[in-house]
Amino acid sequence: MEDISEIFDIYAICACCKVLNSNEKAGCFSNKTFKGLGNEGGLPWKCNSVDMKHFSSVTSYVNETNYMRLKWKRDRYMEKNNVKLNTDGIPSVDKLQNIVVMGKASWESIPSKFKPLQNRINIILSRTLKKEDLAKEYNNVIIINSVDDLFPILKCIKYYKCFIIGGASVYKEFLDRNLIKKIYFTRINNAYTCDVLFPDINEDLFKITSISDVYSSNNTTLDFVIYSKTKEIHEEINPNDELFNNTFLGVCDEKNTNFDDEDDYTYFSFNKHKDNIKKNSEHAHHFKIYNSIKYKHHPEYQYLNIIYDIIMHGNKQDDRTGVGVLSKFGYMMKFNLSEYFPLLTTKKLFVRGIIEELLWFIRGETNGNTLLEKNVRIWEANGTREFLDNRKLFHREVNDLGPIYGFQWRHFGAEYTDMHADYKDKGVDQLKNIINLIKNDPTCRRIILCAWNVKDLDQMALPPCHILCQFYVFDGKLSCIMYQRSCDLGLGVPFNIASYSIFTYMIAQVCNLQPAEFIHVLGNAHVYNNHVESLKVQLNRTPYPFPTLKLNPEIKNIEDFTISDFTVQNYVHHDKISMDMAA
């Protein structure tokens, strides 16, 4: 037997609170905790603007493209069942809208200034209310005497979806007769006096399938859940799917698109303020190629998407360098090192420089001249006389960068004098310790390498940006997670992704493991103002397949690696993009 609620797209939408002085045992909660629907002919709570915005968004939203498919479904049903249409007394509707069905009490509870509910077809279900009882301005409101009177209207009228909006007896009849496809349910997280309760939801028939963000309004928190009939719930969900937890399953299935899921995704986006969606709208027209890519599953898009988000939605701030930035806080990227080496392809990167700097860190060096002699200029601007003097390091020799990364990795806690001193056996050799733990205590949760030494920060030419990494061993594979406090998306982050990936490959090899994942956590992520135009160019480039990285398999000691022990194979890339460093 066909489900009428499915054919004619009938839904319920409601908001319920906790009931003051209910008999529910203290501390024992369930889905039935939220059941308070009304009190003394109105809502139990004062106006909740977030819930009202959600209600309006859900019941007003229509999708013209999806409507044609919904109409085809309904027409097919009526043709199959030889349904004869009778349009007598049913008003014609040209504009596509949703239907809202309510009882007499619910209609009367709506403030006059909001009657009838705009951009919706208002239907009142009442055995006593007559058309002549309504004011002339409500001439387009439809009155029906029973639930059965609704179906001739649904068969004839142009509409997108039909929402049952109250009250309790109306909800109950539609639920009892199995005429509800989904329930859009607001949970108002506060207790109020209630004299009307929402009817019990049959949890064998309906299950919660979606839960929104949590909001605050009128001194209470609230969220929105969607109850779906159990037959419509996806039986198999792959938690490893890239879109799991972020996108409704039906959205990305071109062959079996679930229009309800598309709409639900839109409903849950109701509270995204328009001024935030295009915060930096002056840049919007520069991303034609980037926006033309429908599915951005290539792992490089993790990086590119962050840049796009910051350019479009970032906060405009002044910064230490005086250049100014667009910034946001908190991102994560994850790269599968067992499949590829994440060396960005949308611009050519200086691979040799990345490796030389990493080897320099591993040796515990702080002398910038060592890198300059190899024509690696990553630290050049931070070692100048002017830069060191600005850091109040007047006594420091040019290119003496102080107790930065490598010093902390190999000599944490040692007293720093200058770049020429011998620090052998001084301080804590963190790198040696983590390799020892990986080899001998691989399940340890303390395999951490930290460059953030508060005592030494003022002595450093530049306090560390990538400050901490942790390693994880499982099934013969090594993963690394790194936290970066300050993230220069244009210049620094591409190097950091590659550097810590190489570092993970190296440690995996000397510990007789295989590389697994590199996870990159970004704190203050920013785009310098003088990098924006260059990054627009980069975002409109399409990534190529990542290359692979091969290490000399004979190397078993982390300190024995040299530049000749690294081979990057099949690095296909776009041209170099120049950006000035903000120092």
From Swiss-Prot:
Which HAMAP family does this UniProt record tie to the protein? Thymidy_synth_bact
- Cellular component terms per the entry's GO annotation: cytosol; mitochondrion
Keywords of this entry: Methyltransferase, Multifunctional enzyme, NADP, Nucleotide biosynthesis, One-carbon metabolism, Oxidoreductase, Transferase
**PANTHER family given for it?**
THYMIDYLATE SYNTHASE, THYMIDYLATE SYNTHASE 1
Q: Which organism's genome codes for this protein?
A: Plasmodium chabaudi
- Which Pfam families does the UniProt record give? DHFR_1, Thymidylat_synt
> Which intervals of the chain are annotated as region Thymidylate synthase?
298-583
Q: What is the effect of changing residue 106 to I?
A: In pyrimethamine resistance
Q: Under which name does UniProt file this protein?
A: Bifunctional dihydrofolate reductase-thymidylate synthase
The similarity annotation says: In the N-terminal section; belongs to the dihydrofolate reductase family.
What does the subunit section of this Swiss-Prot or TrEMBL entry state?
Homodimer.
Q: What is its EC number?
A: 1.5.1.3, 2.1.1.45
Recorded hits in InterPro entries, A to Z, give:
DHFR-like_dom_sf, DHFR-TS, DHFR_CS, DHFR_dom, Thymidate_synth/dCMP_Mease, Thymidate_synth/dCMP_Mease_dom, Thymidate_synth/dCMP_Mease_sf, Thymidylate_synthase
* GO MF terms, alphabetically ordered: dihydrofolate reductase activity; thymidylate synthase activity
